[in-house]
UniProtKB/Swiss-Prot annotation:
Keywords: ATP-binding, Coenzyme A biosynthesis, Cytoplasm, Kinase, Nucleotide-binding, Potassium, Transferase. It is found in: Cytoplasm. One of its GO terms (cellular component) is cytoplasm. It comes from the Bacteria. Substrate binds at Y90, G97, A98, D99, R100, T172. This is Type III pantothenate kinase. It comes from Aromatoleum aromaticum (strain DSM 19018 / LMG 30748 / EbN1) (Azoarcus sp. (strain EbN1)). Its EC number is 2.7.1.33. The keyword Cytoplasm applies.
Length: 242
């Protein structure tokens, strides 16, 4: 069995696979990282850990400490020029975030036509993946929660809003929430224009904020939970077969 780890800015997502089968999956906040040891204890057949980490060196060290029971150090995946049928056309391929890279690999395995790969969380990433497997570039913007916090922290009279989304807001809280959410959806739809004319073009939408965006998108899309974990599974299986 293999333990997959997606250490993000807010949460640590995990999954356990055996061959093609998913055995278990879940998520922890950073403060609960030691509980990864319980996952190891519950799955005594674990032999490898494969993961991505964008949360920094301290979290990486805490994860490694919690997973000592596996018997081998975590294999952290980093972006490269090519892997699992995806070619990285970033100006400096190694600079691409590991989570974005692995999400692209997961998307390639799920959808062979042109696609827009969206991961909506603390930050929102929107990446263009060609039918050829070429990653043609993408954008990063603050997630909805960060946008709301930026308004609250950098203006004198705007609070951290707990409003709701409406088409034409008539109060400040709703105006902030609706504006931030429209900004997310608008960025996604604008990026989709680059591939909208291509056969089978589709958006793959993942991340903790995906549910809030679904009702706003006027483009073909599929909701894919834990796309980074799915990409890690592709990487782990390819390595095992090599």
């Amino acid at each position: 069995m293999i333990l997959l780890i997606d250490a993000g800015n807010t949460r640590i997502k995990w999954g356990v696979i055996r061959g093609e089968a998913w055995i278990a999956e879940g998520a922890l906040i950073h403060a609960e990282v030691a509980a990864l040891g319980d996952i190891v204890a519950a799955h005594p057949g674990l032999r490898r850990v494969v993961g991505t980490n964008v949360a920094g060196a301290d979290i990486a060290a805490a994860i490694a400490a919690a997973l000592r029971g596996v018997g081998s150090a975590p294999q952290w995946i980093h972006a490269s020029a090519e892997r699992c049928g995806v070619r990285n056309r970033y100006d400096n391929p190694a600079q691409l975030g590991a989570d974005r890279w692995v999400a692209l690999i997961g998307a390639r395995a799920l959808h062979r036509a042109a696609c827009l790969v969206v991961n909506a969380g603390t930050a929102t990433t929107v990446d263009v993946l060609a039918a050829s497997g070429d990653f043609d570039g993408g954008i990063i913007l603050p997630g909805e929660d960060l946008m709301r916090r930026a308004l609250a922290g950098n203006t004198a009279q705007l609070p951290f809003a707990e409003g709701r989304y409406v088409g034409a807001p008539r109060n400040t809280a709703d105006a902030i929430v609706s504006g931030c959410r429209n900004a997310q959806a608008g960025a996604i739809e604008r990026m989709f224009r680059q591939i909208a004319h291509l056969p089978g073009a589709r958006c793959l939408l993942s991340g903790g904020a995906a549910p809030q965006l679904e009702e706003l998108l006027g483009i073909p899309f599929s909701r894919v939970d834990n796309l980074v974990l799915k990409g890690l599974a592709v990487v782990a299986r390819e390595d095992a077969a090599a």
